[in-house]
Regions:
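Short beta-strand segments that buttress and anchor functional surface loops
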Residues: 49-56, 73-79
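Beta-strand/loop substructures that line and gate deep hydrophobic ligand-binding cavities in soluble
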Residues: 78-130, 137
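A short, structured loop/turn motif at beta-sheet edges
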Residues: 13-16, 65-70, 89-98
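Short, surface-exposed coil-to-beta transition loops
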Residues: 5-7, 58-62, 82-87
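Hydrophobic ligand-binding cavity/cleft-lining segments
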Residues: 1-42, 137
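Hydrophobic pocket/interface hotspot
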Residues: 19-23, 29, 51, 64, ...
Length: 141
């Protein structure tokens, strides 16, 4: 089945190291991850680490599948939305960070793919925008 890839790039007014720290610290992840109430993991994170994310309406287990400090962080959902992967690429931009967020979804069926593409509540780009706004707020703390 075909995959859907969503990419969002922006500049965040903080150094790469600080952005990477906020993205990868389980204690701050619930601040920027949309609808997350809690994130449970044993820090520090590394490739292969597993995290439990408690959202408003569901729970998910995610596994870190890409970790290259301070430039790359990525995970794959192991429970909940099993076919979703999220990646963050951080690049030096002076005193700021160029941040690219990519969400990749491997649709299990044509019907599932159509639901995600057509259903307003599955507004992936809107969720990515909320994630970035939340991250900006978390960086101000």
């Amino acid at each position: 089945m075909r995959s859907a890839t969503y990419t969002f790039t922006t500049v965040v007014p903080a150094p790469v190291e600080r952005v990477f720290q906020v993205l990868t610290d389980p204690h701050t992840m619930a601040q920027w991850l949309p609808a997350a109430r809690a994130v449970e993991a044993v820090p520090p994170l590394k490739k292969g680490s597993r995290l439990r994310v408690v959202y408003d309406t569901r729970e998910a287990e995610i596994e870190v599948v890409d970790f290259n400090q301070p430039s790359v962080f990525g995970w794959s959902e192991r429970s909940g939305r099993r076919s979703w992967r999220t990646f963050f690429r951080l690049e030096f931009a002076g005193a700021s960070t160029r941040l690219t967020v990519q969400v990749v979804w491997q649709a299990p069926s044509l019907i599932a793919w159509l639901k995600v593409k057509l259903k307003q509540s599955r507004n992936i780009t809107g969720q990515m925008d909320v994630m970035i706004q939340n991250l900006r707020l978390a960086l101000e703390k």
